[in-house]
Regions:
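Residue-level signal for inorganic ion chemistry
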Residues: 1, 51, 203, 237
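Short intrinsically disordered, low-complexity coil segments enriched in acidic
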Residues: 1-7, 34, 42, 190, ...
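Switch/coupling subdomain of P-loop NTPase systems
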Residues: 2-39, 104-106, 115-117
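Solvent-exposed alpha-helical segments within well-ordered globular domains of core cellular machineries
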Residues: 6, 10-17, 21, 28, ...
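Residue-level signal for secondary-structure boundary sites
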Residues: 6, 59, 98-100
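Detector for methionine-enriched segments
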Residues: 8, 55, 139-142
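Charged, surface-exposed helical/loop "interaction arms" that form contiguous linear patches used
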Residues: 20-74
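ATPase nucleotide-binding head domains, primarily ABC-like/P-loop NTPase cores
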Residues: 73-236
Length: 237
């Protein structure tokens, strides 16, 4: 290798090392500068996230033609000063399922006074009972998230601590679960958690077994939920 080439190679390597050292210096200065502004930058990022969330909620409300509902606060626990009201007031007017085509969806009205805990939805198959349950559940979840609701003005919805639902057929061949047993597993879990600050949605309660036995089971489940003062909506089979 010619001596001139060796000298040029050494010089090229020196320049590489100087470049790497300069990059490290620049990055170090930048990191130190950012560190001095860490609190301000953190606050700015959080503020931008809050603003982005508020803008997204506003745009979504505009798409849904949504309104701001009245939020009903928690009931008082038994024995507390605010424990006089028997139940939550639920008043959804012209409520629309937010995921269905607005041009085709049929609005529903759902109302529970403060003296009621349960509402039974009955009607023919494909009549919209399950969609009604899902609509109420989504309204409750959206209210919890601080979203406006696709409902008419004057609607009111409670603030629930828990929303529990058993909707649809979850039979499992792998776990040897029939339609009835899968529903029963879900309901057992719900009964163990739901309390007077919960919304419980049950679809086709007691279905999948002998009608007489299913009716007795449904009655026992509803009685238990009523005793616990759970706000409950049930669709019949």
């Amino acid at each position: 290798e010619p001596l001139s080439a060796v000298e040029m190679g050494n010089r090229w390597r020196e320049l590489q090392l100087e470049e790497e050292k300069e990059i490290e210096r620049i990055l170090g200065d930048l990191a130190a500068h950012v560190a001095r502004l860490a609190d301000e930058l953190t606050w700015t990022v959080e503020a931008l996230a809050d603003l982005d969330l508020a803008m997204a909620k506003g745009r979504y409300a505009n798409v849904l033609d949504a309104t701001e509902p009245e939020l009903i606060p928690f009931r008082g626990r038994p024995g507390s000063v605010a424990a006089g009201e028997a139940g939550y007031r639920l008043d959804l007017r012209q409520a629309r399922h937010p995921l269905l085509d607005p041009a085709r969806v049929v609005p529903i009205d759902v109302a529970l006074t403060g003296e009621q805990y349960a509402l039974v939805i009955t009607g023919p198959n494909t009549g919209g009972k399950t969609v009604s349950l899902k609509t109420v559940g989504l309204m409750a979840a959206m209210a919890q998230a601080g979203l406006h609701l696709p409902v008419a003005e004057g609607s009111a919805i409670p603030v629930f601590e828990g929303i529990y639902a058993d909707i649809g057929d979850e039979q499992s061949i792998e776990q040897s679960l029939s339609t009835f047993s899968s529903h029963l597993n879900n309901i057992v879990a719900i009964l163990g958690r739901a309390d007077d600050r919960s919304l419980v949605l049950l679809d086709e309660l007691g279905a999948g077994t002998d009608p007489v036995e299913g009716s007795a089971l449904a009655r026992a489940i509803l009685t238990h939920l009523l005793d616990r003062r759970c706000t409950t909506l049930v669709a019949t089979h």
